[in-house]
Amino acid sequence: MDMQLLTIGINHHTAPVALRERVAFPLEQIKPALSTFKSVFLGHPAPNAPEAAILSTCNRTELYCATNDRAARDAAIRWMSDYHRIPADELAPHVYALPQSEAVRHAFRVASGLDSMVLGETQILGQMKNAVRTASEAGSLGTYLNQLFQRTFAVAKEVRGTTEIGAQSVSMAAAAVRLAQRIFEQVAQQRVLFIGAGEMIELCATHFAAQGPRELVVANRTAERGAKLAERFGGRAMPLADLPARMHEFDIIVSCTASTLPIIGLGAVERAVKARRHRPIFMVDLAVPRDIEPEVGKLKDVFLYTVDDLGAIVREGNASRQAAVAQAEAIIETRVQNFMQWLDARSIVPVIRHMHTQADALRRAEVERARKMLARGDDPDAVLDALSQALTNKLIHGPTSALNRANGADRDSLIDLMRGFYQHAPRSSDTSDR
């Protein structure tokens, strides 16, 4: 069986954050996960180990692979279920399995921002490049996925360079500010705490800082990085360990860390609300897995929003850019066809390689026979003639035998094929009896 492309995954279209956080891969787990995925196929009849890459973000977890194993789809879904210890019947309804051109189209759309919650956002392209880099370091990339991702990045660049897909987009960070303004009439009068110091927190800090908040504080596990980010926006840093004791000081809390477990629990928030004498707290949890226990959202004076909640606001700004979407989709469709042509051409490579191997074996055998003839003193001209005759006979033996065995339409097709091979073959009208 030829190598087949396959994408298995879940995203914000197919699964809520409560499930997405359970199938997310922390960065440090991706390389070991790729290793275990490849090991699944060691006992299968397919001769080659699969190529694989894992893309894991707040909005999606996807496994891209290239394999010649017919059972790859079911094996990949079962592996994802087993790896995350989620019952298959619970996970399967939310999983999409995209083969061949569908997988290619999906990769192009994801990198171009067409499949993002924030239409046209650029962060996903960097995340995909990081996923490819990690897979490369893990030794799980090969010819097929390398080619897929290189073309994916080229398509994303083309889409962003020739369409207005990213123009006037409402980012998650901007959506967070809009929601805060619904709770607090003046963000400028509020104290804002950011937990984490990654790219998403940096974007949020940029948007909130533009509102001139009363105070801006960054709490991060790495103190130096948190201090550097806080200084950039005229704020100050706070040790993450101080969070439980000082949470009540802040009106707005935005969290996005790489923690695999919640860092803000129900009890801590209850104490903060009590200390604030029930003044409202606006909380945004942009992390997947979530940083804030979901039960916090049930508290009377807490307004908790997740990435899925912010998505509703983001989608309000997507409708106005449908012309750019149509233009981007047209570009992608053309590039999908181009890639599939390359993929189809790859399927003949083993055949060509086999033909070369056979022809070279024939050549070596006849050259060795000619050397023996020369060694025993045969006439060189006769040896050359015998060599060329033997090579000619053996090289045309296969095509000639195939023609003799063929009947009817198969024979006609073979004749046309042979005429294409041998450009100087006489036409049928030239081969009639004279």
Curated annotation (Swiss-Prot):
Keywords: NADP, Oxidoreductase, Porphyrin biosynthesis. GO terms for biological process: protoporphyrinogen IX biosynthetic process from glutamate. Substrate binds at T57, C58, N59, R60, S116, E121, T122, Q123, Q127. Belongs to the glutamyl-tRNA reductase family. This is Glutamyl-tRNA reductase. The active site is at C58 (nucleophile). Homodimer. The record marks H106 as: Important for activity. Its EC number is 1.2.1.70. It catalyses: (S)-4-amino-5-oxopentanoate + tRNA(Glu) + NADP(+) = L-glutamyl-tRNA(Glu) + NADPH + H(+). During catalysis, the active site Cys acts as a nucleophile attacking the alpha-carbonyl group of tRNA-bound glutamate with the formation of a thioester intermediate between enzyme and glutamate, and the concomitant release of tRNA(Glu). The thioester intermediate is finally reduced by direct hydride transfer from NADPH, to form the product GSA. Gene3D superfamilies: Glutamyl-tRNA reductase, N-terminal domain (3.30.460.30), NAD(P)-binding Rossmann-like Domain (3.40.50.720). Pathway: Porphyrin-containing compound metabolism; protoporphyrin-IX biosynthesis; 5-aminolevulinate from L-glutamyl-tRNA(Glu): step 1/2. Catalyzes the NADPH-dependent reduction of glutamyl-tRNA(Glu) to glutamate 1-semialdehyde (GSA). InterPro entries: 4pyrrol_synth_GluRdtase, 4pyrrol_synth_GluRdtase_dimer, 4pyrrol_synth_GluRdtase_N, GluRdtase_CS, GluRdtase_dimer_dom_sf, GluRdtase_N_sf, NAD(P)-bd_dom_sf, Shikm_DH/Glu-tRNA_Rdtase. Possesses an unusual extended V-shaped dimeric structure with each monomer consisting of three distinct domains arranged along a curved 'spinal' alpha-helix. The N-terminal catalytic domain specifically recognizes the glutamate moiety of the substrate. The second domain is the NADPH-binding domain, and the third C-terminal domain is responsible for dimerization. One of its GO terms (molecular function) is glutamyl-tRNA reductase activity. NADP(+) binds at G196, A197, G198, E199, M200, I201. It comes from the Bacteria.
